[in-house]
Amino acid sequence: IDERDRMYREAFRHMPDGTYVHKQDVFLKKDYHRGKGTGSFLDRADARHFEGRLYIDHTCILHFVLAGLKSLEKAYVSSPLAYKEHLHREDYKKLEAFLEGIDNAVSILQNMRGTSVLPMSHEWISAFTHAYSGLFGDTDAVVDIHIDGSLHVGKNHARCYAVCDETFLPEGSIESYVRDESLPPAASQLYHPLMEQLGMYLPYNHIVNQVIYFEGNEKLRSRIARNIDIYGSNSSMNKTIEREFKELDKLQKEIIEDNQMLVRSFFSVCVFDGSDTELEKADKRVREVLNLNRFKYYIPGYENLAKMH
């Protein structure tokens, strides 16, 4: 797990400023049905054994987005097939660095054990976007989307939970992995990533979003330095400001010592189902996992929920 964590960090380390990397994991409850292939005797026996059983289907999408190209819209409208030639020089350099960063990231991810990365076709993107908008209900149906305190799409209802501020994180350091407590004690110990309980371990329809925004390493470091100066000059006013000053100062020293790259991040999980009973079970489990891991969370509604969806 540590090695995968290191390779993930290295893969995205050289993305240019203004880049969003969005990892989206979709988990859907489905009934297992064997394919048309015959296979061996054992394969056919396994297929009969699992026929009709419930399982979780997992799809992982990795989105790369570059923001801030001022001349892109005009260039694309005037010539969709040759828009690069009409970009301003500064925007063209940003785009080239962005595409190079994607190639480097994918190359590193491809070398991770048991990992393959495939480009999505136009048809696949269109089908996925349509299915996602309808919360993976009837793909041929056109449904209404209603948003109040929760999300209603056709027969499906959804609830979302977001970790969108550093104050929502647990105090102290966060481990990249924890012990797997889902299995009975044995001679050996198993481990999994911290939030894996909201992945394949969560037996409900759900979507996990992890977004990293590369706002600019030097820009964010300068902001921390300014905040330290502000808190430092006012630290004698009360104990809270003094404590914040000491924590920021300690953080800055760790960043410099480890040469860490600073980014902004966002995490959310959305559970959905056509059954209110199943939705309540999923809701209870998500809250339990977040609370046990000492994460605070925001439950968006109305306008903010619409923006998330």
Which residues does each PLM region occupy?
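Extended, folded cores of ATP/NTP-driven motor/assembly subunits in large transport
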Residues: 1-309
